[in-house]
C-alpha cells in the first residue's frame, strides 16, 4: 500500500495497523531474557503528521514491593516524549565573560566570580580581583544540550523549546551574596529557520551587558553569547518511517500511521485527557495474559528513548522554571533491506521511573487532581473503556488497584466493578496521604486537615445538593462546617457552665453535608475526638478573655489605659526600642557559667553587646566589644572633640599609634576562648565583681580600675540620664558607644552612605609638643585621687559650691574599643576605635541628684571620695581611615577585610543619614588634599546629650553626626 493510500484510509484501518504494531511489541517482550520486573503498561505513541504536535502517553506502575499503592507520576513520561514530532539539534552554547565595570571603590581587592547556571549544573569562571572598579575575566563557559524546534512560529518560522539560563555575580568570600542575577532564554539567539540550523556553519554571536544590583548597583557585566551546532544530524520523528524491531533481528513490519488531529503537548495535561488511554493498552494486557499467563505477575520491559547522551529539557508549568531530567538514548539501524532508513525509538521506562520511590508527594498530587477533575463529570466515566471489537474494557483500572497475579478478563468487568475499583483507588490514596502527614502538626491543624480530606475523599461526587436544591462545592461545605463550630462556640458564651451538647452538632453536620452511611462509618470516632478537642480549646480561650475583661472592669481600666505608660528608649538601627522603666535589658552571657562581662589581663574588659543592635542582620551574627582602661585627657588638648583630634593628628600617624597603644592598650585575645581569658586573668579578689555572681564565675576587678564593667548592668542598657559618679560614666555611655561603633565600622570600610562635610588641617604645633600632651593623660583612678587631694586642701564651702574646681569641672575620658566575633575565635572585626566621653561636674547636691539606678545598684557608702556626681555632655567615636589593602600600624589588612566581610554578610551596609556638623571650628579646606586618598582621622558624635527631658524626643532625633575629617599634617605637607 502506498503512502497516499494509507493517509486516506479510515479510522478502522488505522486501528488494525496499530494492533499489528502492538503485536510486534508483545513478541519482543516474550523473547527478552532477564529477571522479572513488575508489569508496565505502555501506550505506544500515536504520531501525527504535524511537526510539533503529538498525543499523550500514560504509564502505570504496579509494584508488589511497595507497602502501599502510590499513584504513578504521569508527568515524567509525558515530558520525555513531548519533543516527538520536533527536530532535535545538538547545540553548544558559549558564554564569553569579558569584564565587570563601574564597581564601587569599596569593593577594590574583592574577588568576584560569574556563575552560569542551567538547572542543577553550575559553571563558574575563575576569580577575578577588583582593581579600580573593574574586574577582568575574558573567559569562556560552554554548555552543550539538545534543542528541539518546529515550524510553528509566525510565517512558518522556527519555534524552539525554551532554554532558561541564570547568570549571576557573587564574591568568592561571600558566595551567598548575589550582586545581581538575570534569567535569559538562549534560544533567542538561534536562527529563525530550521534550514539555517542545518547549514554548514550555523553560528551567531550576541554582545550584551547586564546591570548589577546590591552593593554593585552601578556596575555593568559585559557578556557575549554564541552557539554552534555540534552535528548536522536531525532527529525528525515525522519525516522518517518508524518501525519497532524486536531483539534478535526478527523481521518486522513497517507501518505508517494516518494523520490525526493535532493535539498540543504541554507539561501538565488535564486529568480527563490523561484517562483517555490508547486502545492498545487493553489489547497488550490481553495478549500478555493469553500467551504467557505464568509471567503475568511481572514482565521485563526494556525500552529506551531515542536521543543522544544529553539531557532532554522540559518546562515546569507549576513554577515557570525548567526542571532537569536525564534520558538515556538508543538508536538502532534495521538490518531489513525493506527498511533502509528506518529508525527505532525505544523508551527506557525503568530509567524514567528510577526515582519513583523518592517522589511520593508529587505522585499523590496527581491522583488528587485526577479524582477531583473526574468527579465533575460522571463517576462511571472515570475509568477508560476502550475496545477494538466494541466491547468495554477496564483492565487498566484493575492493574492500578490490584496486585494479584491473575489477569482479569476485560469482558467480565461492568460498571459496578469500575465503581468499586475507583473507590479502592481513592481509599489507597487516602491511606498514603494520611501516612505521609507530619507528626509535628498540632491537634488543631491535624483535625482540620483530616476533616477536609475526609470530606473530599468520602463523597462520591464533587457537588452536594442542599435542602434548597442548589449544588455546593466541598470548599463551601467546609466553610459551613466551620460556621457551625463557631456557632457552637457562640452558644458557649451564653452557657458558662459548659453544658452545651455538641454531639448533636456533629449529627446535624452529617445531615447537612449529605454524607452516605459509609462516610459516617469511616473515621467517625476520630473526627468526633478532634472536633471535641478543638471546641475545648476554644472554650479555654473564651474563658481567658472573659476573666481578663472582668479584671479590667474591676480595676476601672479600659483598652486605652496603658497607652501612655512611661518607657525609656534605647536605639537600635533606625527605630527605638522601648523598655520598662523598672527593668533594664539583660545582655547575653559570653559563655557557659560566665556573665555578660569579663576582665582581661591588661585591665580592660570584654562586654557582650546589646543583641537588639543586630536584629536587622541577615545572619544575626552577635559581636562582642573589647574595651580598654579609660584615661583622662589633659584640658590643654582642647574642650571639643574635633579640637582634640586636631592635636592627635599633629602628632603623626606613627606617634599617635604608639602613644594610644601605650596609654590604653588592648590585650590580644584572638584564638582564645572566653574561658581561657578568664583563666589567664588572675586578679586579687578585692573590689566589685565584673561578672554576674549568679552565673557561677567570679572575676574581680583589678585594683585601680573603678566600675568599668558594671556588675548588674544597671547603666549599660537603661541609659539613665541623671548624674552618676565618675567611675560609672563608662557603663552609662556604653550603649551609645555600641551604636557608634557599628557606624564607625562602616566608615572604616568605606560603606557609609554619608561623606564628611570636608577635611581640615591639624593644629599648627610641633609634633613633639602634641605627643607630650598625650603622655600627660592620667588613669581614672589617678585623677580621682588627685581630685580628692585638691578637695581636702580647699575650703569646704567652696567645695560644696563647686567654685574651687573651675579647671576640673569638665573632663574628657578616652578609651580604645575593638569589635570581635566570638564565632571566629574572637577575630577582630575592623580596626580599633577611640571613644571620647565628655563629662561635666554636677553642682547640685550629690544626695538629691544621684541616679536612681546607682542608688539601687550600690550603697552610697561604697562610692567613696564623698562621691562627686557627673553628667555626660557628649559622646564621640573616632578612628583612622587608611589606604585599603595594606598593613598599617593602626590595623592590619586582615582586620580591614574582616570588617567588610561582616558588613556584607549581615546586610548592615546601609545606615541612617547624618546631619551636618554644627562645629564652629574654622575650616581650612585643601582641595588638592581632599581629592586624593589620604590617611585621615574621622569622627562621629552622638546627638543624645543625656540631659533630663531629652529622651522624650529621642525617637525623632538623628542618632549621630558626622564631623569633619582631620588630615594628618605630614600627608598634607607632602601633597601641597
From Swiss-Prot:
Region (Disordered): 309-343, 381-419
Pfam families referenced in this protein's UniProt entry, alphabetically: NT-C2, PMI1_PMIR1-2_C
Ranges of biased composition (kind: Low complexity): 394-414
Domain of life where this protein originates: Eukaryota
InterPro entries: NT-C2, PMI1-like, PMI1_PMIR1-2_C
Feature: compositional bias, Basic and acidic residues: 309-319
Location of the C2 NT-type domain: 81-229
Function: Seems not necessary for chloroplast and nuclear photorelocation movements.
Name of the protein in its database record: Protein PLASTID MOVEMENT IMPAIRED 1-RELATED 2
Organism per entry: Arabidopsis thaliana
Amino acid at each position: 500500500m502506498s503512502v497516499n493510500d494509507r493517509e486516506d484510509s479510515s479510522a478502522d484501518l488505522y486501528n488494525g495497523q496499530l494492533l499489528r504494531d502492538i503485536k510486534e511489541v508483545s513478541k519482543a517482550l516474550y523473547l527478552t531474557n532477564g529477571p522479572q520486573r513488575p508489569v508496565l503498561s505502555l501506550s505506544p505513541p500515536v504520531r501525527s503528521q504535524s511537526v510539533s504536535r503529538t498525543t499523550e502517553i500514560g504509564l502505570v506502575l504496579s509494584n508488589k514491593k511497595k507497602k502501599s499503592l502510590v499513584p504513578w507520576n504521569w508527568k515524567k513520561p509525558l515530558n520525555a516524549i513531548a519533543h516527538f514530532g520536533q527536530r532535535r539539534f545538538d547545540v553548544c552554547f558559549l558564554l564569553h565573560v569579558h569584564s565587570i565595570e563601574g564597581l564601587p571603590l569599596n569593593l577594590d581587592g574583592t574577588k568576584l566570580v560569574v556563575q552560569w547556571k542551567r538547572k542543577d549544573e553550575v559553571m563558574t569562571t575563575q576569580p577575578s580581583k577588583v582593581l579600580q572598579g573593574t574586574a577582568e575575566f575574558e573567559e569562556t563557559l560552554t554548555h552543550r544540550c539538545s534543542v528541539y524546534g518546529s515550524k510553528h512560529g509566525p510565517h512558518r518560522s522556527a519555534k524552539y523549546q525554551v532554554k532558561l539560563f541564570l547568570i549571576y555575580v557573587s564574591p568568592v568570600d561571600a558566595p551567598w551574596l548575589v550582586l545581581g542575577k538575570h534569567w535569559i532564554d538562549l534560544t533567542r539567539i538561534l536562527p529563525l529557520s530550521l534550514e539555517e540550523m542545518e547549514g554548514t556553519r550555523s553560528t551567531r554571536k550576541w554582545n550584551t551587558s547586564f546591570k548589577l544590583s546590591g552593593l554593585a548597583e552601578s556596575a555593568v557585566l559585559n557578556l557575549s553569547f554564541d552557539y554552534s551546532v555540534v552535528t548536522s544530524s536531525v532527529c525528525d520523528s515525522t519525516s522518517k518511517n518508524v518501525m519497532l524491531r524486536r531483539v534478535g533481528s526478527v523481521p518486522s513490519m513497517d507501518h505508517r500511521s494516518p494523520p490525526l488531529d493535532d493535539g498540543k503537548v504541554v507539561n501538565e495535561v488535564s486529568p480527563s485527557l490523561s484517562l483517555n488511554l490508547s486502545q492498545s493498552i487493553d489489547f497488550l494486557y490481553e495478549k500478555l495474559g493469553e500467551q504467557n499467563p505464568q509471567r503475568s505477575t511481572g514482565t521485563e520491559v526494556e525500552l529506551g528513548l531515542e536521543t543522544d547522551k544529553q539531557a532532554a529539557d522540559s518546562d515546569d508549568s507549576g513554577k515557570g522554571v525548567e526542571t532537569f531530567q536525564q534520558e538515556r538514548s538508543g538508536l538502532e539501524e534495521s538490518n531489513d533491506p525493506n527498511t533502509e532508513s528506518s529508525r527505532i525509538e525505544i523508551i527506557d521506562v525503568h530509567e524514567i521511573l528510577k526515582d519513583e520511590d523518592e517522589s511520593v508527594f508529587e505522585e499523590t498530587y496527581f491522583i488528587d487532581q485526577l479524582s477531583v477533575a473526574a468527579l465533575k463529570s460522571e463517576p462511571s466515566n472515570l475509568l477508560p473503556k476502550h475496545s477494538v471489537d466494541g466491547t468495554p474494557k477496564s483492565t487498566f483500572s484493575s492493574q492500578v488497584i490490584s496486585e494479584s497475579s491473575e489477569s482479569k478478563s476485560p469482558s467480565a468487568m461492568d460498571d459496578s466493578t469500575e465503581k468499586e475499583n475507583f473507590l479502592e483507588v481513592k481509599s489507597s490514596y487516602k491511606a498514603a496521604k494520611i501516612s505521609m502527614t507530619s507528626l509535628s502538626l498540632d491537634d488543631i491543624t491535624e483535625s482540620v486537615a483530616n476533616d477536609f480530606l475526609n470530606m473530599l475523599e468520602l463523597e462520591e461526587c464533587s457537588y452536594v445538593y442542599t435542602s434548597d436544591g442548589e449544588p455546593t462545592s466541598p470548599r463551601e461545605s467546609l466553610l459551613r462546617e466551620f460556621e457551625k463550630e463557631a456557632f457552637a462556640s457562640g452558644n458557649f458564651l451564653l452557657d458558662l457552665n459548659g453544658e452545651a451538647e455538641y454531639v448533636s452538632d456533629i449529627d446535624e453536620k452529617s445531615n447537612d453535608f449529605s454524607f452516605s452511611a459509609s462516610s459516617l462509618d469511616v473515621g467517625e470516632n476520630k473526627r468526633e475526638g478532634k472536633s471535641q478537642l478543638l471546641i475545648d480549646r476554644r472554650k479555654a480561650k473564651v474563658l481567658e478573655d472573659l476573666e481578663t475583661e472582668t479584671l479590667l472592669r474591676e480595676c476601672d481600666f479600659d483598652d486605652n489605659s496603658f497607652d501612655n505608660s512611661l518607657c525609656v528608649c534605647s536605639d537600635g538601627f533606625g527605630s527605638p526600642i522601648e523598655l520598662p522603666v523598672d527593668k533594664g535589658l539583660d545582655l547575653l552571657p559570653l559563655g557557659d557559667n560566665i556573665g555578660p562581662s569579663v576582665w582581661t589581663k591588661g585591665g580592660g574588659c570584654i562586654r557582650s553587646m546589646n543583641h537588639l543592635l543586630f536584629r536587622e542582620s541577615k545572619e544575626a551574627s552577635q559581636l562582642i566589644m573589647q574595651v580598654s582602661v579609660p584615661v583622662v585627657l589633659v584640658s590643654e588638648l582642647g574642650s571639643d572633640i574635633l579640637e582634640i583630634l586636631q592635636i592627635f593628628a599633629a602628632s603623626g600617624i606613627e606617634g599617635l599609634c604608639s602613644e594610644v597603644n601605650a596609654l590604653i592598650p588592648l590585650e590580644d585575645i584572638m584564638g582564645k576562648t572566653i574561658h581561657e581569658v578568664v583563666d589567664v586573668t588572675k586578679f586579687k579578689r578585692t573590689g566589685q565583681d565584673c561578672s554576674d555572681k549568679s552565673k557561677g564565675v567570679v572575676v574581680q576587678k583589678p585594683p585601680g580600675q573603678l566600675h568599668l564593667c558594671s556588675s548588674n548592668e544597671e547603666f549599660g542598657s537603661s541609659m539613665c540620664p541623671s548624674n552618676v559618679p565618675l567611675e560609672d560614666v563608662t557603663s552609662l555611655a556604653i550603649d551609645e558607644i555600641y551604636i557608634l561603633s557599628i557606624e564607625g565600622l562602616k566608615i572604616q570600610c568605606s560603606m557609609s552612605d554619608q561623606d564628611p562635610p570636608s577635611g581640615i588641617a591639624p593644629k599648627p604645633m610641633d609634633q613633639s609638643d602634641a605627643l607630650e600632651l598625650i603622655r600627660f593623660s592620667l588613669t581614672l583612678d589617678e585623677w580621682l585621687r588627685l581630685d580628692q587631694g585638691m578637695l581636702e586642701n580647699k575650703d569646704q564651702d567652696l567645695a560644696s559650691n563647686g567654685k574651687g574646681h573651675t579647671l576640673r569641672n569638665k573632663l574628657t575620658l578616652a578609651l580604645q574599643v575593638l569589635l570581635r566575633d566570638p564565632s571566629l575565635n574572637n577575630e577582630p572585626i575592623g580596626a580599633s576605635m577611640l571613644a571620647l566621653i565628655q563629662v561635666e561636674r554636677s553642682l547640685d547636691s550629690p544626695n538629691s541628684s544621684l541616679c536612681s539606678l546607682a542608688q539601687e545598684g550600690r550603697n552610697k557608702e561604697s562610692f567613696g571620695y564623698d562621691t562627686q556626681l557627673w553628667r555626660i555632655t557628649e559622646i564621640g567615636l573616632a578612628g583612622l581611615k587608611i589606604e585599603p589593602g595594606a598593613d598599617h600600624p593602626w590595623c592590619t589588612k586582615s582586620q580591614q577585610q574582616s570588617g567588610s566581610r561582616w558588613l556584607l554578610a549581615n546586610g548592615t551596609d546601609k545606615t541612617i543619614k547624618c546631619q551636618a556638623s554644627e562645629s564652629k571650628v574654622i575650616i581650612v579646606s585643601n582641595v588638592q588634599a581632599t581629592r586624593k586618598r589620604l590617611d585621615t582621622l574621622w569622627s562621629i558624635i552622638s546627638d543624645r546629650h543625656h540631659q533630663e527631658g531629652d529622651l522624650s524626643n529621642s525617637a525623632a532625633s538623628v542618632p549621630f553626626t558626622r564631623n569633619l575629617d582631620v588630615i594628618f599634617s605630614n600627608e598634607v605637607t607632602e601633597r601641597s
